[in-house]
Curated annotation (Swiss-Prot):
Forms oxaloacetate, a four-carbon dicarboxylic acid source for the tricarboxylic acid cycle. Signal peptide: none annotated. One of its GO terms (biological process) is oxaloacetate metabolic process. The keyword Secreted does not apply. It comes from Neisseria meningitidis serogroup A / serotype 4A (strain DSM 15465 / Z2491). NCBIfam families: PRK00009.1 (NF000584). This is Phosphoenolpyruvate carboxylase.
Amino acid sequence: MQLHILNNPKDAALAADAEFLKQSLFNLLHEEASPLVVETVKLLSTSDDSAALIEKVLPQLDEQQTHDLTLACGLFAQILNIAEDVHHERRRQIHEEAGRGGAEGSLTETVRRLKAGKADGKSVQRQLDNTSVTAVLTAHPTEVQRQTVLNFNRRIRALLPQRERCTNADALARLRREIDTILLGLWQTSETRRHKLSVNDEINNGVSIFPMSFFEALPKLYRKMEHDFQTAYPDVRVPDILKIGGWIGGDRDGNPFVSAETLRFAFRRHADAVFRFYRGELDKLYRELPLSIRRVKVNGDVMALSDKSPDEETARAEEPYRRAIAYIMARAMGKARALGLGMGCKFGFLEPYASAQEFLDDLKKLQHSLIDNGSRLLAEGRLADLIRSVSVFGFHMMPLDLRQHAGKHADVVAELFQHAGLEDYNSLNEEQKQAALLRELSHQRPLYSPFITYSDHTRHELAIFNEARKIKDEFGEDAVTQSIISNCEQPSDLLALALLLKETGLLAVENGKPKSRINIVPLFETIEALENACPVMETMFRLDWYGALLESRGNIQEIMLGYSDSNKDGGYVTSSWCLYQAELGLVELFKKYDVRMRLFHGRGGSVGRGGGPSYQAILAQPAGSVAGQIRITEQGEVITAKYADPGNAQRNLETLVAATLEASILPDKKDPDAKLMQDLSDVSFKYYRELITHPDFIDYFLQTSPIQEIATLNLGSRPASRKTLARIQDLRAIPWVFSWMQNRLMLPAWYGFGSAVETLCEGNPDTLAALREHAQSNPFFQAMLSNMEQVMAKTDITLAENYAGLSESPDKAKVIFGMIKEEYRRSRKALLDLLQTEELLRDNRSLARSLALRIPYLNALNGLQVAMLKRLRKEPDNPHALLMVHLTINGVAQGLRNTG
């Protein structure tokens, strides 16, 4: 990587921040580590081959020195990440303050494009009214850092911008001391988790993002949306188009520890966080609105609230707004108490609000009165933000989806049938299953009996649905709105879930017609399932019963698409094309049956699991597939990187909204050449499958990656694999991708591409020209190549060869690695040919700069990891070697800013 890329004048502040933090870290090392460790770290920063340097130095280090060196390299990656994040925010602010208009991906730029595209106010309002964007936080185990460590990093991030504002040496010294103190705490804190996370731990971690970020970021973003739209379209109003959703506490696919109890715990924690936020905001409003009846007029609605106020202080007699706020707070906190939350209220407790809408109505009475009586500025400040917050967060803070494997649903149905004396469900063919399920769904008679003893699994599953019904009653109808069927393969999978909803009071049958309180969402995730998505849904749409069910849910059908398993099945090219084709087919099918479609994209953080920049990914969707409706999963390290800071959260959520609106209102795009893409997919699939089905491949993978050690990292509450590892399909997608990132091959994101391009273009210049034209003009192909370019820039075939040396069968490993190395050469060459460039990241200076900063420490961590894996394979019970491997996994993930 060319280090001269850091010499751009725009990056002077970044260079200064990085140097400032590095000096603090060296100050720490001089105090805490040996001179040999300090000298080695200094040499790494200028070394062209830091992995080789590690190999040379390591024999001279004892266990403590090895630990210190590993920790130091990881900390350097962390502080450079912080410096980069601060610089991104700095450049954004400079851009905005210079009045240059909106950057790509901003709402300002999107609104400008809408205006330039002659979109009128009515069409924009119509689109906004039909727009729904949701970022869904999941508990997928990809965040390697402990919350404690993340909190240290946030403190440094908050302090670092002060460096530029220090006007004298004393101020700079004080800042240095603060950061040195935090780094010392970080140095003396365990980087790795010693115990496995529980589901409740994951719930608490997910909830912590809200007071840290979302409670501030969402109202600010809505205010910006209103400003941007009303500047161009004065009459346009912005409804609640953006929300945060979650899976944490309701996703039991592969996780036996998720239960009715964890679902209840999740909503108690949600409500505790959101009611504390409301109480704090109401308290601030109380202090900000001491308006006197002698100075202002007040609407009758507010006077009526004031008359019922528990605030009886004499001084408040002439302050109706304060008295009204006291009344509102007492009722809101009354609801908190009714939900079992242990929080007080200085005004006592009044009759609880029955719904968030009642709470909202009272707040709007305050707002209308202020506006009507000349206090608009007060109405449009904190009060407006609180109104928006209540509208978005309600009493539940964020809705949770339920998710379970189709086979688990079928097991419950089979047991219910058995005890009810019905046919043997598992022995029925698909047509018979549909008929039996529709028969049971057509009337009100339940199958479940409280007088029968069911299996633990059936009791567990029915308990979750029953708990979801109670939660909807207590916390609001929007608390649980989706139930997702993973591994959905046939129509009976949807009908089986419908039957379970009926058995637990979430679906009623009235006059033969169903009415559901929850959306039934099929998840198509393997290559075969994606190809079968349209036939499955067409069968459902032809059923009058299902048509009536959709009517009860607003005639919207949500479809979830899985990126991870399809990639593991067929490789990146085939997965991408299968997903695109599935979307194209679904768009036409939904038009045919006049059903509105909402796609839910199950993307991971890495390219191998559908990751990459969200803006480009959304714009690369087929025309008509977005149509204002989109949900996207966000997980692990992505949640931390995108949303743990209010500024980052606002910017990343703004990008989601901007891309959704652009893809919906300005969908003028052409699809890629279907035959060309299919040919590329077919050949890529052939080469990818040749590799992963090679008889020696699974052993190579298990022996030359830290997959076994990743499983012991305590990243999350669910198991790393579904069964004993003997086949690739038994391994979960996250550790599969995570492992390839650790050994620096990133194989799932590119393997097969080079051979496909070479095969298609050999002796056929027209094909090469067509692919190059697609690389210049087609959003789908551009996004695919852009993601691949980013991954290949992080790939290091020389380091990967060191991992190949871990194999217990060198001759077999030589064959497998030879295949990988040759395909890497072909893929890199093909990528450069299609991009018509001589170097990767030529047009992505930001990522090139980022890698240039971190590569020395990243490569050193890989060198340390290989050495420690060798030691661990020889001494499986060596606790020091295992700890070092865990630390290097942590550090490499930080250096790459990706896990799975």
